[in-house]
Protein backbone atom coordinates (compact mmCIF):
# COMPACT_ATOMS: atom_id res chain seq x y z
CA UNK A 1 0.00 0.00 0.00
CA UNK A 2 1.15 3.54 -0.70
CA UNK A 3 1.52 6.18 2.01
CA UNK A 4 -1.93 7.50 1.11
CA UNK A 5 -3.47 4.09 1.88
CA UNK A 6 -4.25 3.25 -1.75
CA UNK A 7 -2.83 0.27 -3.59
CA UNK A 8 0.50 1.09 -5.26
CA UNK A 9 0.15 1.50 -8.99
CA UNK A 10 2.40 2.78 -11.77
CA UNK A 11 -0.69 4.38 -13.30
CA UNK A 12 -1.33 6.39 -10.13
CA UNK A 13 2.35 7.22 -9.82
CA UNK A 14 2.47 6.20 -6.16
CA UNK A 15 4.95 3.33 -6.45
CA UNK A 16 8.00 3.36 -4.18
CA UNK A 17 11.12 2.66 -6.22
CA UNK A 18 13.34 0.31 -4.17
CA UNK A 19 16.47 1.57 -5.94
CA UNK A 20 15.78 5.12 -4.74
CA UNK A 21 15.14 3.96 -1.18
CA UNK A 22 18.30 1.84 -1.14
CA UNK A 23 20.35 4.72 -2.53
CA UNK A 24 19.14 6.98 0.29
CA UNK A 25 19.00 4.59 3.27
CA UNK A 26 20.94 1.47 2.28
CA UNK A 27 19.89 -2.11 1.57
CA UNK A 28 20.04 -3.26 5.21
CA UNK A 29 17.64 -0.52 6.29
CA UNK A 30 15.29 -1.30 3.39
CA UNK A 31 15.21 -5.03 4.15
CA UNK A 32 14.78 -4.44 7.88
CA UNK A 33 11.95 -1.96 7.30
CA UNK A 34 10.12 -4.50 5.17
CA UNK A 35 10.46 -7.06 7.95
CA UNK A 36 9.21 -4.54 10.54
CA UNK A 37 6.15 -3.60 8.47
CA UNK A 38 3.94 -6.24 10.04
CA UNK A 39 2.60 -9.72 9.46
CA UNK A 40 3.62 -11.12 6.09
CA UNK A 41 0.02 -11.89 5.11
CA UNK A 42 -1.39 -8.37 5.70
CA UNK A 43 -1.34 -5.30 3.47
CA UNK A 44 0.50 -2.49 5.25
CA UNK A 45 0.87 1.10 4.03
CA UNK A 46 4.36 2.30 3.16
CA UNK A 47 5.67 4.94 5.55
CA UNK A 48 8.81 6.89 4.71
CA UNK A 49 9.09 8.03 8.34
CA UNK A 50 9.37 4.35 9.26
CA UNK A 51 12.49 4.12 7.11
CA UNK A 52 14.07 6.90 9.16
CA UNK A 53 13.21 5.04 12.38
CA UNK A 54 14.72 1.81 11.11
CA UNK A 55 17.88 3.69 10.06
CA UNK A 56 18.25 4.95 13.65
CA UNK A 57 17.65 1.40 14.92
CA UNK A 58 20.34 -0.07 12.64
CA UNK A 59 22.76 2.72 13.58
CA UNK A 60 22.25 1.90 17.29
CA UNK A 61 22.95 -1.79 16.69
CA UNK A 62 26.14 -0.96 14.80
CA UNK A 63 27.20 1.38 17.61
CA UNK A 64 26.78 -1.47 20.13
CA UNK A 65 29.63 -3.35 18.48
CA UNK A 66 31.97 -0.51 19.43
CA UNK A 67 31.10 -1.17 23.08
CA UNK A 68 31.89 -4.91 23.07
CA UNK A 69 34.37 -5.84 25.76
CA UNK A 70 36.70 -8.39 24.21
CA UNK A 71 37.92 -9.39 27.69
CA UNK A 72 34.45 -10.44 28.92
CA UNK A 73 34.83 -13.86 30.57
CA UNK A 74 31.28 -15.26 30.97
CA UNK A 75 31.13 -17.07 27.63
CA UNK A 76 28.64 -19.70 28.88
CA UNK A 77 26.06 -17.02 29.66
CA UNK A 78 26.47 -15.44 26.24
CA UNK A 79 26.17 -18.82 24.49
CA UNK A 80 22.99 -19.64 26.44
CA UNK A 81 21.39 -16.37 25.38
CA UNK A 82 22.58 -16.87 21.80
CA UNK A 83 21.06 -20.36 21.56
CA UNK A 84 17.75 -19.18 23.07
CA UNK A 85 17.64 -16.36 20.55
CA UNK A 86 18.40 -18.66 17.61
CA UNK A 87 15.64 -21.06 18.69
CA UNK A 88 13.08 -18.25 19.00
CA UNK A 89 14.09 -16.66 15.68
CA UNK A 90 13.96 -19.97 13.83
CA UNK A 91 10.43 -20.63 15.07
CA UNK A 92 9.20 -17.15 14.18
CA UNK A 93 10.77 -17.21 10.73
CA UNK A 94 9.25 -20.65 10.05
CA UNK A 95 5.86 -19.09 10.93
CA UNK A 96 6.53 -16.03 8.67
CA UNK A 97 6.46 -13.74 11.72
CA UNK A 98 9.30 -11.61 10.42
CA UNK A 99 8.13 -8.46 12.17
CA UNK A 100 8.27 -10.05 15.62
CA UNK A 101 11.46 -11.98 14.95
CA UNK A 102 13.48 -8.80 14.51
CA UNK A 103 11.73 -6.81 17.22
Which role fits each region the language model picked out?
Residues 1-103:
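Long, charged, mostly alpha-helical binding arms that flank functional sites
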Amino acid sequence: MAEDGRKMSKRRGNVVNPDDVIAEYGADVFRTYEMFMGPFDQAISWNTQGMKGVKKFIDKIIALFDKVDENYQDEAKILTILHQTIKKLTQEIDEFKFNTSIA
